[in-house]
A protein has these predicted regions:
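Lectin-like carbohydrate-binding module/patch detector with strong preference for beta-trefoil
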Residues: 1-499
């Protein structure tokens, strides 16, 4: 099982960062022309850069990289010290020597001129070979804040235990909600919040509130690898025979490094007979169980550009429908028989197999694709099993509250947690911080202090993307004004939310 969950390589989202100058402003690719500035105070799309790594970091703590903007252009320094975004003139143009420094800071030195990238708090230039504090950049992961941490050394995921008040590195498969964390950024430091809303402190315990004792320095390497420390030489790493995550000064063999991943979505599937789809042997898949077990959990893998999905079990294998047999649980990644086309309808889904027929449940509980057209027996309901809350990020930022507005906003730098209160499969109540509920105005806007719970329908539209159908029958979307609105009849790009 563990072999199947080892990570292979890095994904583009693992290489995306924001770069913060000494003045606390972000390196920004402006929409007009090819101009580069450093005036933005928050991390948005234009402040997100993808690291294109020419060679991996070495023992000298350096790597050779290019920086690519959200528009697909490369950050290019010129001999006169100016910096802009565009297309490289030759194979060497645009490469920087990336060096890693104390407290997680980076410097970027032009490979051609030897000049360091710097900012005066507004403009960006590259005209000095003498290293100073003005050349230091603090990287901030641009990954969604709901994350998992994977240890390549132990081959396990980090797991919080609120009952024991501590954090372990002992989960080979991250299907538990306790494997999900919120990585909060505040004034240059990071706080790790568990799914039970406790914070990891520097004394290795979970505490109820963030403080200086829960603030960590973050070191980031290309490929999404991070290390968290107290800034005085101690780092977090698994310790002892039970792999307790704690601060120490003697990590061995790189055990202080974790791969930062977006928290994956795990679901349960219920058939019309109200039974859970469950793997009951190595091959056999049935909808007979009235109780959830880990063998009823499936990781939802999908591409946002298609309606094709794969359902991965805790064994690391996939559900597959082969020839005229019932569904089995030993499918492989990208195997045609393990790919299903999903259609959504008011919280229910139907699954079309590779043979063009729809998946249904037989009288004895087996799953098989025989129906030419979907009916009630081919409908399934799903529920998120590792998400007690949502942190939604859309086109313009996170969904949250602002002291300057009554309505919920969709352009925030940090999210508000939306507690999910399930009432039916795929139907949830949205509870705001403080115990009140989301309320919907006549104008399609939202306020977070309602007295009564409303029904929201979640539709998964990608591995970590969803659309939300509001109580008024419209999809929730992000508006460029920053206001969250429920007024879209169809699902557009503004209706898709990372979660």
């Amino acid at each position: 099982m563990e072999e199947d969950w080892v990570l292979h390589g890095s994904r583009p989202e693992d290489q995306k960062v924001g770069l913060i100058s000494w003045a606390g402003t972000y390196l920004t690719a402006e929409n007009y022309g090819n101009k580069i500035t450093a005036v933005a105070k928050g991390l948005g799309r234009r402040q997100t850069w993808e690291l294109i790594v020419c060679n991996e970091q070495d023992e000298d703590c350096q790597a050779v990289v290019r920086l690519q903007s959200i528009h697909g252009h490369i950050l290019l320094p010129e001999g006169d010290g100016s910096v802009y975004c565009g297309w490289p003139r030759n194979t060497q143009h645009g490469y920087f020597l990336l060096r890693f420094h104390r407290h997680g800071k980076w410097t970027l030195q032009c490979m051609i001129t030897g000049h360091y990238l710097e900012s005066d708090g507004e403009d960006v230039f590259c005209n000095s070979r003498v290293l100073s504090a003005y050349h230091m950049w603090a990287p901030r992961p641009a990954l969604h804040v709901h994350v998992m941490l994977y240890s390549p050394i132990t081959r396990c995921y980090v797991r919080a235990s609120p009952e024991q008040g501590c954090v372990w590195v002992d989960a080979p498969v991250p299907y538990l909600e306790e494997c999900g964390f919120l990585l909060h950024f505040n004034e240059g430091l990071y706080h790790l919040e568990s799914s039970s809303h406790h914070f990891l402190s520097q004394n290795d315990r979970l505490v109820s509130r963030p403080s200086q004792q829960t603030a960590f320095h973050l070191q980031l390497r290309p490929g999404g690898q991070i290390a968290l420390g107290d800034g005085e030489g101690c780092l977090l790493y698994p310790q002892g025979s039970r792999a307790l995550l704690g601060l120490g000064s003697s990590p061995m063999g790189g055990e202080e490094w974790f791969v930062l991943q977006h928290c994956t979505a795990w679901i349960t599937i219920k058939s019309k007979n109200r039974k859970f789809v469950t793997i009951i042997s190595e091959l056999e898949v049935c909808a007979r169980s009235e109780r959830m077990t880990p063998m009823s959990f499936f990781q939802y893998e999908s591409n946002a550009n298609t309606n094709a999905i794969q359902l991965r079990s805790v064994t690391g294998q996939y559900l597959a429908q082969r020839s005229h047999r019932a569904v089995v649980g030993d499918g492989q990644k990208l195997e045609p028989d393990a790919i299903f086309c999903v259609s959504w309808n008011c919280g229910k889904i139907v699954l079309r197999a590779a043979n063009g027929r729809y998946l249904g449940v037989t009288s004895n509980g087996f799953l098989i694709a025989t129906a030419l057209h979907p009916g009630p027996c081919e409908e399934f309901r799903i529920r998120l099993v590792n998400r007690p809350f949502l942190a939604l990020r859309g086109r313009y930022g996170y969904v949250g509250t602002s002291s300057e507005h009554d309505q919920l906003q969709c352009n925030m730098d940090q999210p508000d947690c939306i507690q999910l209160l399930p009432c039916r499969q795929s139907i949830y109540h949205f509870q705001a911080q403080g115990g009140t509920f989301w309320s919907l105005t006549a104008y399609g806007t939202f306020r977070p202090w309602g007295k009564f719970a409303l029904n929201f329908c979640l539709e998964l539209r990608g591995s970590n993307l969803l659309a939300v159908l509001a109580p008024n029958g419209y999809y929730i979307r992000a508006d460029s004004s920053g206001v969250l609105l429920a007024d879209s009849e169809a699902i557009t790009s503004e209706c898709l939310w990372e979660f």
